[in-house]
Curated annotation (Swiss-Prot):
The gene is ureG. GTP binds at G14, P15, V16, G17, S18, G19, K20, T21. Keywords: Chaperone, Cytoplasm, GTP-binding, Nickel insertion, Nucleotide-binding. The lineage of its organism: Bacteria, Pseudomonadati, Pseudomonadota, Alphaproteobacteria, Hyphomicrobiales. NCBIfam families: ureG. This is Urease accessory protein UreG. One of its GO terms (molecular function) is GTPase activity.
Length: 210
């Protein structure tokens, strides 16, 4: 059922390799029976992430689009989001009953943020393998995203990372804003991300016709 004010648009950002596309894939597969979904990915010169989602069967191919940003991918989600806004508009035209649009940014750094014109909610994904100092470094993704996902917690023993330190630093940097510790390879923590989206985004589940 379409939302009165249009679909919930969720921006998913984070450094390369942190698990953004994996999260997109899992969210699509878990939620597609309850919501009408579309997925938009951003890459600089390719459509690799969109092609991955198609190969994985995340959604039907007509519900997945890849945006080639060229140059700086951060501009395409912030200062000049016109390409992504056009992609969202195209999806809404094709699927008037859309409930949810997931928008994955290109290779981000800690300073990347989504324009409020493009995303209603933002999720920022970091991974333990990059080091347990990442939450303490701050940056808009760490401090201002609606939900911070600390992924690949299973790798902590292998890279000498302290999950306790990451939790303490995340709480200190984010204040009351929530964060989730995950191992998306095993879907651990996915339920908490979905619960956040449904509660914060005001989604109301209804069965989706096949």
């Amino acid at each position: 059922m379409a939302r009165y004010n249009g679909p919930l648009r969720v921006g998913i950002g984070g450094p390369v390799g942190s698990g953004k596309t994996a999260l997109m894939d899992l969210l699509c597969k878990e939620l597609r029976e309850r919501y009408q979904i579309a997925a938009i990915t951003n890459d600089i010169y390719t459509k690799w992430d969109a092609e991955f989602l198609v190969r994985s069967g995340s959604l039907t191919p007509d519900r997945i689009v890849g945006v080639e940003t060229g140059g700086c991918p951060h501009t395409a989600i912030r200062e000049d989001a016109s390409m992504n806004l056009a992609a969202v508009a195209d999806m809404r035209a094709k699927f008037p009953d859309l409930d949810l649009v997931l928008i994955e940014s290109g290779g981000d750094n800690l300073a990347a943020t989504f324009s409020p014109e493009l995303a209603d909610l933002t999720i920022y994904v970091i991974d333990v393998a990059a080091g347990d100092k990442i939450p303490s470094k701050g940056g808009p993704g760490i401090t201002r995203s609606d939900l911070l996902v600390i992924n690949k917690i299973d790798l902590a023993p292998y890279v000498g990372a302290s999950l306790a330190k990451m939790e303490v630093d995340a709480k200190r940097m984010r204040g009351e804003r929530p964060f989730v510790m995950t191992n998306l390879k095993q879907s651990a923590g996915l339920d908490r991300i979905i619960a956040f989206l449904e509660a914060k985004g005001g989604l109301q589940a209804e069965p989706v016709d096949a």
